[in-house]
Amino acid sequence: MSERVHRNSAYLNGKSTTGTITRVKDTSPTSGMCPICIRDCPIMCEISLSSFRGREALYPEPVQFGYSTAGALKDFGLDWSHFNIQAGLFEALGIEENSDVAIFPNVSTETKVGGIPIKVPILTGAFGSTDVARLNWEGLAIGAALSGAIVIVGENVCGMDPEAQFTNGKVTYSKELKRRVDLFRKFWDGKYGDIAVQTNVEDQRLGVDVYALSKLEVNIIERKWGQGAKAIGGEVRVRDLDRAIMLKKRGYIVIPDPEDPTVQQAFKEGVFKSFERHSRVGIPKEKNMVEDIEWLRKQGAKHVTLKTGAYRPSAVAYTMKIASEAKINALYFDGAGGGTGMSPVPMMDEMSIPTVYLEAIVLKCAQILKKKGRYVPDLIMAGGFINETQIFKAIAMSNFGDGPFVKAVLMGRSPITAVMKASYFKQLAEEGKLPKTFADRFGSTPEKFFIAAPELKEKYGERFKEIPWEGVALYTYLTDRLGVGLKQLLAGNRKWKLELINRNDLMSLSDIAAKVTGIPLPHEVEKDAIERILD
């Protein structure tokens, strides 16, 4: 059973994200240190690790880079568990009031994001140049295509591609980006979902947007202003000296300097085992952004989206203003607590606005824009989403009566978990090393333990052999779990169409939730209705 993080500073000196622990469990609630810190202690706490490895201690365990994702450990005091969903009884909205018809399989979870239809209100990504995205891309792309979802290729893919070709500083070919687009389209039905290419400052300098639009015929370009896990540029680890030098020559910030002879010697001697590659941070301006969006559309972008992080409220308002002026199709806000391939752990825990707080601020801005008759782009929330209850709550909270502002959620870590777990268990099955309890419950071959396999075999016939088990896993997670789970919640709420759920379908379970969102506590809900009904 997992241990819940204390709502004080007791967790500061021992975090699973950095692989650190303390000698005793009853640590100081002020500092996280052991009440008695002794000399003869072999345990590696945060202070200890920092004294040996310095900046490495800022990040999730370096040895796990490429084979893991990370998220915040801190309890922010308000999350989606602070709300419950109202159950209905006397009506059936969005469907015929017939008990033979109003059953949960008939619920529609379809929606549109920026004009793009999707089967479930989920986008996956953004999966950029970090190794965990590259290594798991086949399952991520094909699984999203099978699910009718949108998948987003993240930042720096072309810049990190050793086989990329450039002319006058602009990319003219990228084997890796082409691979990513082609894998999605292999099983894309051409109707539901799509693939987007995200671009940051480095990507724009390299002309990744033009290449993706003109050569790969991508329909969606996403500009990136930030993410919830960090408020600085994208980061990856590079374990090869020659590659680190290549990236520096391509204009990236590489730390330490791979061309420094002293650094090279230390690397060869094993003093450190990886370099850090960092991206620059953009400083957006309203006029430049509006012109940029117009330029992208002239280049052939059918849909333009913007992803930003969990910046201060005034920055949220300014972002909403610019997105409105530029008529951006969809705008993503990524709350603190979300996932990463590599972000500073202290920044994940201690910086930026947590998701529920952030959505409340975003919705305030959306209401102001709408009241003024201004354009409001479709909104997507991100930051720690893993199941259908959170999705329901995020969408319902955004509907003040004229339809939800939030059309879908963006999920990053959980799709990777689904794909990684499938890859690992496929390997264990091939080696005959599956855990006995798992094999006894679900079977010893992928054909048996992936419950959606028969359905996909029936649908795709001979082509099923081309679907990796990792793709089957993501489809199962997004469609058979989240999709069906969402249908059940909607039916229990007595609404058979996603756009019908609203704020009245939620209740706050804590004073802070009620104060932040304006959603009342259970005993305060529908008080007037009670009086009226019993009159």
What do the PLM-derived regions correspond to, one by one?
Residues 267-458:
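Glycine-rich phosphate/ribose-binding loops and adjacent secondary-structure elements
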Residues 126, 131-323:
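Active-site-facing alpha/beta catalytic cores
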Residues 415-535:
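Short histidine
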Residues 154, 303-307, 372-374, 493-503:
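Flexible, glycine/charged-enriched surface loops at secondary-structure junctions
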Residues 124, 144, 331, 394, ...:
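Conserved, mostly hydrophobic/aromatic
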Residues 1-120, 132-136, 142-145, 150, ...:
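Conserved, well-structured core domains of diverse proteins
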Residues 109-110, 163-194, 198-202, 428-466:
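A structural-propensity feature for long, helix-poor, extended segments
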Residues 39, 145, 149, 294, ...:
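Generic secondary-structure signature for well-ordered alpha-helical cores
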